[in-house]
Design a protein with these regions (language model features):
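Hydrophobic alpha-helical segments and helix pairs
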Residues: 105-166
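Structural alpha-helical scaffold elements that stabilize or flank donor/cofactor-binding regions
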Residues: 18, 125-126, 153, 169, ...
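Glycine-rich, Arg-bearing micro-motifs that act as flexible, cationic patches
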Residues: 134-152, 173, 265-287
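A short acidic, glycine-rich active-site loop
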Residues: 76-92
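Small/aliphatic-rich secondary-structure junction motif
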Residues: 2-78, 156-159, 170-240
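Structural beta-alpha unit
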Residues: 1-17, 60, 93-132, 231-262, ...
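Short, flexible loop segments at boundaries between secondary-structure elements
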Residues: 161, 286-296
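Redox-cofactor binding/interface segments in oxidoreductases and associated redox assembly factors
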Residues: 27, 133-135, 178, 264
Length: 296
């Protein structure tokens, strides 16, 4: 491993005097217990960017117990009424949390939306936001999850997606780790993260297996991206590793760096979803213990 501060291979780029902002942040919630934390996290981002904050509550798949599958007539109506009542109660609690966050952070533009998990409008809502925040999936496959929503948004929305960890804690994004391999996806992720990078105190660029990818990285891997990031005002360091499991190295380095956010491109060996979410992307998608911004 080697480490260096932002190299100076060329004239440094002058630091920008004004910070770029996100215009609209959209956060998805459902009936999971970490809704308060993900709403808080989105609220912090909205406050710092002066952004409009939209919360979309995705109504969960009704959980049907074995006895309920045999319900008929009055019994089935009672089951439906009970589930509707539970859903209304959950949504009311989430909305109260959302409205409290909007008030505490002085967010002047906000909106609450409620959609069925199967509605085609769920994904459409994400297409026009500057940043989308959603809980990352768990291997447990909870029935309350909109099926494959997080993966689908990363794959096809064309928007930067922050995957918030289950049971995560909301905090301001001040330390950012970038998984950098100089691919189109990584370039897109860094560009999408500029409003966050511009507010960071420290940024680290992690490059793995750079010797095999010199054609993409140039003479000194990480030098040019570090120079451009330094212009945003943050302290930038570059870490170079000759080899290793990229996904696990990203996650372990995020812990070592005390990162508040990991930024990376989502990529794979095929456009098929099963293969796209293999390798590095799949490791991070299901195992990250910190928020991860993915772009593709």
């Amino acid at each position: 491993m080697s480490q260096c501060t932002a190299p100076n291979l060329a004239e440094p780029i002058p630091r920008t005097s004004s910070k770029p902002e996100l215009g609209e942040i959209l956060v998805f919630t459902d009936n999971r217990s970490e809704a308060a934390s993900i709403l808080e996290f989105a609220g912090l981002l909205a406050e710092e960017n002066g952004a409009r904050l939209i919360s979309v509550f995705t109504q969960p798949v009704p959980a049907v117990t074995p006895p309920q599958t045999f319900a008929r007539g009055t019994s089935i109506r009672k089951v439906i009424e009970e589930q509707d009542s539970q859903l209304e109660s959950i949504e009311a609690r989430h909305r109260a949390v959302f409205e409290d966050i909007v008030r505490r952070y002085g967010i002047s533009r906000s909106e609450w939306r409620s959609l069925s998990h199967w509605s085609s409008e769920v994904a459409v809502n994400a297409y026009y936001a500057d940043l989308v925040v959603i809980s990352r999936p768990e291997r447990t496959g909870q029935m309350s999850d909109p099926p494959g929503l997080a993966e689908s948004l990363v794959l096809s929305s064309g928007r930067p997606i922050i995957l918030f960890p289950p049971r995560g804690t909301a905090s301001r994004v001040r330390r950012i780790l970038i998984g950098w391999n100089a691919t189109r996806e990584a370039i897109r992720a860094v560009a999408d993260a500029v409003p966050l990078l511009a507010r960071a105190d420290a940024v680290e660029v992690l490059i793995v297996d750079y010797q095999r990818q010199r054609a993409r990285h140039g003479q000194e891997p990480g030098a040019e991206i570090a120079r451009r990031l330094a212009a945003l005002g943050a302290q930038v360091e570059v870490q170079r590793l000759s080899s290793g499991d990229v996904g696990h190295l990203l996650l372990s380095q995020a812990v070592a760096f005390r990162a508040d956010l990991l930024v990376m491109g989502a990529y794979g060996h095929s456009t098929l979803r099963e293969r796209l979410f293999g390798g590095v992307t799949r490791t991070v998608l299901y195992q990250a213990g910190l928020p991860v911004l993915m772009s593709r």
